[in-house]
Amino acid sequence: MKSIIYICPSAKNKPTGGIKIIYRHVELLSNLLPKGTESKIFHFENTNFKCDWFPHKVNFKKNSTFDSSKEFAIIPEWMAVYHAKILQNQNVKYGIFVLNGFYIYKKPKNNFTNLDIYEAYKKAEFILSCADEITEGIKLTFPEFKEKIVRVNISVDSRKYYCSKEIFEKKENLITYMPRKHKNNSEILLYILNRHLPKNWKIKSVDNLTELEVANIFKKSKIFLSFSELEGLGLPPIESALCGNHVIGYTGEGGKEFWNAPIFDEVFSGDIRTFAKKVIDKVTDFEKNGYIFNNFKPYIDKLADKYSVEKEKSSLSSLIEQIKNF
């Protein structure tokens, strides 16, 4: 059995869902792999780097050369074409982890072609997908490689993102959102909302915070505004919902697999008027009828089960069995 190395960027140490998912996989795999094998993060830009905006217990690969007899590499899709070439030259077997099906086409600006993208996927031993939308995107782009697709689960840490009755009762009249996506849309919407919201309601931006700080704010807010762009499986809508928020906004397409009433309320991307009306109506509803814990709890529990650590571990155990063949 080979050690499993996840190639990972640093993203300038800013909170990024994809990187958190990669770290989580490595952490869980380290406890599932047989003795004598490891799972590690390889930060190719700086081998001494490690993320510090969320807690983790992962091992890091410090040398930049791969041992084809002992190591199997997994590359995120947005840098697959570049690293696939290097690994092919070293005869290192690899898989591609597609975290966002809309990034399959990504390649460095110089010296790479669309044919290189195709070759990267053709020579991959498997293609990992963590969402229904991603799986369908891979099939659409590369129908000839559909047998290579391996579905893996991701989890949201229920020790951090949860909502008890006590938390629910202490919630504030607070609306949260993340400003990194669809900035122009959010600015327009916030201006409209600030014209209509009751004076006892506030809107708070959630940005550049640690994972724990984000979870604590989500536990205080009642509504989360989703400005997801084209995404594989955006974590913030799930995390906020698990903390007892009513989520209104864009699914990012990948979110459609969990975007169900009564917790989630979809708005088509760019439909600002409908977005504003849904938020105002929900605030009016909460003001009139209150914010009732029992209305949310069964759906929160169902969402927590869908993205549980147990399901993620099970899918990673299956992944280990796949890699044993290589």
PLM-predicted stretches and their roles:
Residues N46-K123:
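Extended catalytic core of nucleotide-activated donor transferases of GT-like folds
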Residues G18-I21, I134-T141, R151-L212:
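Conserved catalytic-core segment of nucleotide-activated headgroup transferases in glycan assembly
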Residues Y82-A84, A124-K146, I188:
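A short, active-site helix/loop in glycosyltransferases that binds the activated sugar's phosphate group
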Residues M1-F72, L235, E253-G255, V267-S269, ...:
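N-terminal pre-catalytic "stem/leader" segment of glycosyltransferase-like enzymes
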Residues H246-G249:
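Short hydrophobic beta-strand element within catalytic cores of glycosyltransferases
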Residues G270-K277, E287-N325:
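A charged, aromatic-enriched C-terminal amphipathic alpha-helix characteristic of glycosyltransferases
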